[in-house]
Regions:
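Feature activates predominantly on carbohydrate-active enzymes
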Residues: 1-159, 163, 190
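Active-site neighborhood of glycoside hydrolase catalytic domains
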Residues: 123-220, 224-241
Length: 245
């Protein structure tokens, strides 16, 4: 049997900005197997489109999938089945609390951060988990729907997001930043309760000199960018987090 000589040889597929059919993704998985990959991260939600069937979203009045292009949950189960046969781990990726413009456009305006950070270019794509308990509850419900679905399908890891929820993380007060970290820890706990290992992108977590929080050390960190005041790899390692670079 031939296999990768590294622990995590992964392929990230953005199937949210651009829609890919079930058959196309299955064909890619087969090719990845021949190239000794051992995992594929399927990123199915972006500002440009939410591409996986959702009971939570379909309950919103007027909600529509962009161009009616999306994978059904049955499609995803078939993708996971083929991936298992080819020894490719499927890692779902649902970015939050930002990159959710395709969802927020169907929700009340105060569900987004537009009123809190009016000068920030990404405000309308970020859920207001600071002052709107209904918005926070909705987002937790959405994350829980897919944590439940993918854990029941046998997936072991889940990327809960964490990147680019605002253009300037320095806009946060210390109290607001603590709320962000509490959100990540809460979603992490939900994933762990279902036997999944949570992961996030690095740029929005442990940022700058904010204090008063402790990031869950069980969260895997996908270290993809290092803008000013971002936590270093060393800082994550000291916190106990596994870093993927």
């Amino acid at each position: 049997v031939d296999y990768s000589d590294v622990e995590d040889r992964s392929f990230h597929l953005d199937c949210a900005r651009k829609f890919f059919t079930k058959d196309w993704i299955i064909s890619l998985i087969k090719d990845l197997s021949w190239q000794k990959y051992n995992s594929i991260q399927l990123h199915f939600s972006e500002n440009e489109g939410f591409r996986l069937q959702s009971d939570t979203l379909e309950a919103i009045d007027g909600f529509q999938y962009v161009n009616n292009q999306y994978l059904t949950k049955q499609d995803m189960l078939e993708i996971i089945q083929v991936a298992n046969e080819y020894h490719i781990e499927v890692i779902p990726s649902l970015d939050s609390p930002g990159h959710l413009g395709a969802v927020l456009r169907y929700l009340p305006s105060d569900y987004s951060c537009a009123s809190l950070f009016p000068s920030d270019g990404r405000r309308a794509q970020c859920f207001n988990i600071f002052t709107n308990d209904e918005a926070r509850g909705f987002l937790i419900d959405l994350m829980t729907e897919f944590i439940d679905f993918f854990s029941e399908a046998g997936c072991k890891r889940f990327n809960i997001g964490g990147d680019e929820f605002l253009e300037k993380f320095s806009n946060f007060s210390n109290e607001q930043y603590v709320q962000i970290m509490e959100y990540f820890n809460e979603v992490s706990a939900i994933a762990k309760s279902k036997g999944m290992t949570p992961r996030t992108w690095n740029d929005g977590v442990m940022y700058g000199n904010y204090t008063g929080y402790k990031l869950d050390p069980d969260i895997e960190i996908c270290y993809w960018a290092a803008p000013q005041n971002c936590a270093s790899i060393e800082k994550f390692v000291q916190n106990g987090n596994k870093v993927i670079n």
